[in-house]
C-alpha cells in the first residue's frame, strides 16, 4: 500500500503518514488509508456490463474479474516489480499522457512497430523527477524486454552570499528514482571527510514541503562542472533502473 501511494499519487490519494524520501518509516497500516482519484474510476468502468470474464476467487465463494476493463494501459503507466520462483519483473512507470497518445496511435494503426511507438513514449517517467542519461539501453529494454535506465539527479548552480562574500553552490533539485536523500547527503559528507571529493566548503539539506533542495557550497575558484561530474561518478546522484519487462499474458509469464 505504501509503495503504491509513493509511486502513483496521480491515481490514488493517500491520507496519513506514508514515509518520506529520507527513508522515514510509514505509519502503521491502521493509521493510513487510500482513496481512488477520479481518473482511476476508468480502470473499473463498465465492469458491470460483462466486458471481461469472471472466475472463482481463492475459496470459490465469489466471482472476481480475470482482468480489469481499464481504458488506460495501467501496467505501463504504474510500472510493476516483483519476484517469483525463477523469475522477476521490473517495469518502470511511464507518463500518462505519452502512453495514452501511443495507445490512440496504435488504435488508428495496429501495425505500428515498437520503434514507431517510441516516437510517443521516449523513456520511463519516474515520480521523483531527475534526468534520464542516454536512451540506447532504454530502447533495448523496449525492443527486447531487458534494458537499463541510467538516471541522474537534476542540479543547477547558484551564487550565494556568505559572510559578505559570494560563493558558488551546487543545488540538487531532483533525485533519481528510489534514491534515499538522507543517505545521499551522508555519502557526500563521508567522501568529503575522506578527501575523496574535494572542493566542497559546506553541505546542508534545505528541503521542505515545497521540494528538494540540497545545497553544496564550493570553495573559492573551484569548477562546479568538475564537482558535479564527480558527484555523478561517486554517489547515488547517478543510479540505474534495470528493466525486465515480464508480465502475465493469458495466465503465463512472458517477456514483453
Model-based region annotation:
Residues 2-3, 231:
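Hydrophobic/aromatic pocket-lining and membrane-interface residues
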Residues 3-148, 213-215:
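Catalytic phosphate-handling regions of large nucleic-acid enzymes and associated NTPases
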Residues 6, 54, 155-157, 200:
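Generic preference for hydrophobic/aromatic residues in regular secondary structure cores
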Residues 69-108, 157-185, 189-256:
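Feature marking long nucleic-acid-engaging regions of large polymerase/nuclease enzymes
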Residues 144-160:
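Eukaryotic nuclear low-complexity, Arg/Ser/Gly/Pro-rich intrinsically disordered regions
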Amino acid at each position: 500500500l505504501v509503495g503504491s501511494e509513493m509511486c502513483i499519487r496521480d491515481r490514488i490519494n493517500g491520507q496519513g503518514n506514508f514515509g518520506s524520501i529520507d527513508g522515514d518509516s510509514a505509519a502503521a497500516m491502521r493509521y493510513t488509508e487510500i482513496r481512488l482519484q477520479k481518473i482511476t474510476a476508468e480502470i473499473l468502468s463498465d465492469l458491470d456490463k460483462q466486458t471481461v470474464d469472471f472466475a472463482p476467487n481463492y475459496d470459490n465463494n465469489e466471482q472476481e474479474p480475470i482482468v480489469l476493463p481499464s481504458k488506460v494501459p495501467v501496467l505501463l503507466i504504474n510500472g510493476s516489480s516483483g519476484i517469483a520462483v525463477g523469475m522477476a519483473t521490473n517495469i518502470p512507470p511511464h507518463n500518462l499522457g505519452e502512453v495514452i497518445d501511443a495507445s490512440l496511435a496504435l488504435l488508428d494503426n495496429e501495425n505500428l512497430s515498437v520503434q514507431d511507438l517510441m516516437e510517443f513514449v521516449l523513456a520511463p517517467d519516474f515520480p521523483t523527477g531527475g534526468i534520464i542519461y542516454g536512451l540506447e539501453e532504454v530502447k533495448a529494454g523496449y525492443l527486447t524486454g531487458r534494458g537499463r535506465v541510467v538516471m541522474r539527479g537534476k542540479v543547477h548552480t547558484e551564487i550565494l552570499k556568505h559572510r559578505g562574500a559570494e560563493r558558488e553552490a551546487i543545488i540538487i533539485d531532483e533525485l533519481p528514482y528510489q534514491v534515499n536523500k538522507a543517505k545521499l547527503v551522508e555519502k557526500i559528507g563521508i567522501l568529503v571527510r575522506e578527501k575523496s571529493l574535494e572542493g566542497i566548503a559546506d553541505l546542508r539539506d534545505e528541503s521542505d514541503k515545497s521540494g528538494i533542495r540540497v545545497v553544496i557550497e564550493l570553495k573559492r575558484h573551484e569548477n562546479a562542472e568538475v564537482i558535479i561530474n564527480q558527484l555523478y561518478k561517486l554517489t547515488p546522484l547517478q543510479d540505474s533502473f534495470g528493466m525486465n519487462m515480464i508480465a502475465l499474458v493469458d495466465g503465463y509469464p512472458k517477456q514483453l
